[in-house]
Amino acid sequence: MSDTSVIPGSLAVRNLFEDLLGREVTVSPGTPIEQSDVPTAVLALFTNTANQLYAILGMQLELAANAGAALGLLPAGAAEDSIDEKKLTPVLAENVFELCNVLTSLLNVEGAPHIKLYQVVYPGMPIPNDAVPYLMALGRRLDLTVEVARYGKGKFSLALAH
């Protein structure tokens, strides 16, 4: 069986963010999310049909808060408050969950096993032991800086587990 795992391109990520948020989004090559960012980052774990970890997404708190606020049509100040407090409000967390769920579409390709969102880990929650090593590893990954117009920017790191 051939490998059908793919990392989406930056254009696909930008288009998805723009379509979902209804505003201009700029993406550019970025550096990987750092270990020091992990405790306050939003992590999304994606699994295949066998419930095996397929990919992990790390969004720096700044990106998660700004995208969550834009999705909910909240003022930029709502995102800034969450960033200052190093946690997401329940409304922002719900919006970020929806964003992560929609991002699953970038991982599903024809002829490959179905990929689903398994879990979203918010700042302050316990992080599954196997998640961070995959997020930090070199290999098949996409590291971007994503900027949401009139809100702000942050790191977006997506790494395949295989």
Identify the meaning behind each predicted range:
Residues M1-H162:
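N-terminal auxiliary interaction/assembly segments of multi-subunit proteins
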